[in-house]
């Protein structure tokens, strides 16, 4: 059985304070952002300004309504998603906010904004190439040579994931103790490229988001393919850090916060991938407190 181990990562927050008077709702401050990032960095928070959240079907998909105003993206596009299930999930994010809207907890909304606005203007092929490139620096392919206890830990916990991926997708991966990492065969890249090509643009945005959290394409594949749970994937991605924490200790509250936050982001990204692969119809749904 795979054991699960606990990666600290930095987070940045912005500020937001803007009045709304338009029949469409854009809750993002200032001009449309153009950062060289994979996804928008959401503003921090603001006072809740709506009471009811609903979804409805429009010509381009499913829309989110805050009271009687339609939600918009940071670039002032109508916030429209491709499936009813995703619309319900996003609406739930907005409906679950209390007196204060905490944008940094609304990962599905952020991913939708990124997919709709595509701030970095990347094509499907570019998204796929970026995802495949993660194999070159995949966390579980990089191994240490010492201490022996960590060497054994990596072998016991990470090797089963690699073996599963090799068998599942019919590709060769391997691992290495070299700083250059393992040599990934061209055929492996082609197989992974072909697999990722089966996903639409929205799902690819979600895949890249999850890979960025876990620093591992292989763990992401295992998670999306239901071979791993979110908890397993997250803690396997933190294997070496957890080893060091067990040996040297840690600041408990900081460790717990980062772990829970990483789980939330990873879970949201994974859910986003699956929901973006679904399609359905809806007449009108109202979500009320």
Swiss-Prot record:
One of its GO terms (cellular component) is cytosol. SUPFAM superfamilies: ATP12-like. Residues 1-40 form a transit peptide. Keywords: Chaperone, Membrane, Mitochondrion, Mitochondrion inner membrane, Transit peptide. It comes from the Eukaryota. One of its GO terms (biological process) is mitochondrial proton-transporting ATP synthase complex assembly. Pfam families: ATP12. The modification N6-succinyllysine is found at residue 133. Disulfide bonds: none annotated. It is a peripheral membrane protein. Gene3D superfamilies: ATP12 ATPase, ATP12-like. It is found in: Mitochondrion inner membrane. Disruption phenotype: Essential for embryonic development since it is impossible to obtain homozygous Atpaf2 knockout mice. Plays a role in the assembly of the F1 component of the mitochondrial ATP synthase (ATPase). Belongs to the ATP12 family. Interacts with ATP5F1B; involved in the assembly of the F1 component of the mitochondrial ATP synthase (ATPase). Interacts with FMC1. This is ATP synthase mitochondrial F1 complex assembly factor 2. It comes from Mus musculus. The lineage of its organism: Eukaryota, Metazoa, Chordata, Craniata, Vertebrata.
């Amino acid at each position: 059985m795979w054991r699960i181990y606990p990666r600290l990562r930095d987070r940045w927050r912005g500020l937001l304070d803007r009045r709304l008077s338009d029949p469409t709702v854009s809750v993002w401050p200032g001009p449309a952002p153009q950062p060289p990032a994979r996804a928008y960095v959401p503003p921090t928070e603001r006072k809740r300004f709506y009471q009811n959240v609903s979804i409805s079907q429009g010509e381009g998909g499913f829309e989110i309504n805050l009271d009687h105003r339609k939600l918009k993206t940071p670039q002032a596009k109508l916030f429209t998603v491709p499936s009813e299930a995703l619309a319900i999930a996003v609406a739930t994010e907005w409906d679950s906010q209390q007196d204060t809207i905490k944008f940094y907890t609304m990962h599905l909304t952020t991913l939708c904004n990124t997919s709709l606005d595509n701030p970095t203007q990347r094509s499907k092929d570019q998204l796929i190439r970026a995802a495949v490139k993660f194999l070159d620096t995949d966390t579980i392919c990089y191994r240490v040579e010492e201490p022996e206890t960590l060497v054994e830990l990596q072998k016991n916990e990470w090797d089963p994931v690699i073996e599963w991926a090799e068998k599942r997708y019919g590709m060769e991966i391997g691992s290495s103790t070299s700083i250059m990492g393992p040599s990934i065969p061209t055929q492996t890249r082609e197989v992974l490229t072909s697999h990722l090509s089966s996903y639409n643009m929205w799902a690819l945005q979600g895949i890249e988001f999850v890979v960025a959290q876990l620093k591992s394409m292989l763990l992401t594949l295992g998670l999306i393919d239901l071979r791993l749970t979110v908890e397993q994937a997250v803690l396997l991605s933190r294997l070496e850090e957890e080893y060091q924490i067990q040996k040297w200790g840690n600041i408990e509250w900081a460790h717990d916060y980062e772990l829970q936050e990483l789980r939330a982001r990873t879970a949201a990204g994974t859910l986003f991938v699956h929901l973006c692969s679904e399609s359905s119809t809806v007449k009108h749904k109202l979500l009320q407190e």
